[in-house]
Amino acid sequence: MKGLIVDEPWISKILRGEKHWEMRSQATAVRGLVALIRKGSGKIVGVARVTGCRGPLSLDELRANKDRHCVSMDEFESGRAMKWTTAWELIGAQSLPTPVPYKHP
């Protein structure tokens, strides 16, 4: 199974079902179930299904979909987040009852 390393607060938002697009700098060909790894923890804390990618997205598209990616538009408009304009679409995120140790290959 592939893994996706995600920083806070984004991974918690994904696991709570609040965030459905994980913003990245590039598209992925990966589809299906992926492990969700909390950045810096060395733990798999959940799973989600990658169903597709969109982008690179324009500022207007990012603005129209803020409820899906949950990133402040100030981050994009200031240029701080402009490298993250490709959305990885996630569905069915679930927390694991007990986090599983993960070692990066």
Give the ranges of each region predicted by the language model:
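Structured alpha/beta reader/binder surfaces that contact nucleic acids or chromatin modification marks
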Residues: 1-105
